[in-house]
Amino acid sequence: MARRNFKVLYVSGEVSPFVRFSALADFMASFPQAVEEEGFEARIMMPKYGTINDRKFRLHDVLRLSDIEVHLKEKTDLLHVKVTALPSSKIQTYFLYNEKYFKRNGLFTDMHSGNDTKVNTEKIIFFNVGVLETLQRLGWKPDIIHCHDWHASLIPLLLRTVYASNEFFKDIKTVLTIHNIYRQGILPFKIFQKLLPEEVCSGLHRQNDEVNMLYTGVEHVDLLTTTSKQYADTIRLDGEETYGLGRILEERKENLHGILNGIDTRQWNPATDKLIKKRYSIERLDGKADNKKALQEEAGLSVDAERPLVGVIAGFDEFQGADLLARSLEKLVALDMQLVICGSGDKVYEKTFRDFAEQYPEQVSLQIEYTDAFMHLAIAGMDILLMPGRIESCGMMQLFAMSYGTIPVVYAGGGIIETIHELQEGIGSGFIFHEYTDDSLVGKLSEALAMYSDEERWPQLVHEAMSKDFAWKSSAEEYDQLYRQLLEP
């Protein structure tokens, strides 16, 4: 095939820095840029949530993308589109907005979240159909629509049914990346029946009276990827780690590929990072202490250069380990350390963490709403990053952390272990606990804290972590190959 610049549209429910709940947002902040550097033209579409500040991110209206009619079976809603460039790039990012669906601040949720499932189901249908209607109005035809997680999983089915006879969409291929198999988008079937034609509804994967969005996407997409080879193997097993998708993923294993995450080293580099207190490098680490002091001050903790500072940056749900963290708190506060917890999500966990922060104000800090700048400072200022997630597809935070000399302590679930050289005989880049229990977590963290006090071995560990190359280059090349194979006639 003659090499040409193909076009790829990325569709996601979250993109950093506009909105962030999970590592998906960090992935979307850098991966499209890496793909562009391989010779593709990349663009992004996402919802315009009420939390997204137009002025801060320089969003502007596009006259020809206003009042787009989105025809659903029982009604027609209007879609308005705003656009800006992904920061530090020229990648056009389109924000799909309808006041009824997106003025509310919440991200997409499903029946297991306890939120208004009727509105959320209508919102997800509107968004998926709206992406395709926006492409038609825009007149920009991608060669590939690359969907991410359950939020965009209806698009492959729509292309195979109601849009199949539309010449504009002819020959468009679809890719679905599974970042989080725990969140599958379980929604009431009756809402789909009200809004979508029978040819679409008959292709939905139903479980009694519920639709599984992610399963539907897996069934109808052309190509499947996830963010590590280990995770690709894990989710094909028909066990509890697959949450019901193991069998269909095993059936589609020839179309399932695991490719490791990377990071944008232009955005995440302590030697050039403009968002941290003081820049530093593997050759000159003294600046890390300044960032620790700044983080302690900003988080409201007592300033103590000697006391180890441990951080957690994760959404508050069981997939990301909020349950394990909550069970471990009593033992964690008994350790000689400080703890910064950054995240949001389940209100029960938020209350648990807030209560501990109020009970131990000089030792525990909770940051529910935080900026991109604070996250950079946290990564630079922490001594240790604790990742209690049950099964990480790959993770991004540990990659950021190691690049900044912050040592990860992680659970051995999923593909995260592909990125960390477990400490053995004094050599490694992080710590891994192998049982999903509070004793295992606290025990491994205690090992890390003990090494932190070793003035000879800890700097060696930091040096090993910072020496690793996590740039997107090799992973982007793998995607380049997959994309081109998919598009071969």
Swiss-Prot record:
This is Glycogen synthase. It comes from the Bacteria. Its EC number is 2.4.1.21. Keywords: Glycogen biosynthesis, Glycosyltransferase, Transferase. Gene3D superfamilies: Glycogen Phosphorylase B. GO terms for biological process: glycogen biosynthetic process. ADP-alpha-D-glucose binds at R20. One of its GO terms (molecular function) is alpha-1,4-glucan glucosyltransferase (UDP-glucose donor) activity. It catalyses: [(1->4)-alpha-D-glucosyl](n) + ADP-alpha-D-glucose = [(1->4)-alpha-D-glucosyl](n+1) + ADP + H(+). The lineage of its organism: Bacteria, Pseudomonadati, Chlorobiota, Chlorobiia, Chlorobiales. It comes from Chlorobium phaeobacteroides (strain DSM 266 / SMG 266 / 2430). Synthesizes alpha-1,4-glucan chains using ADP-glucose.
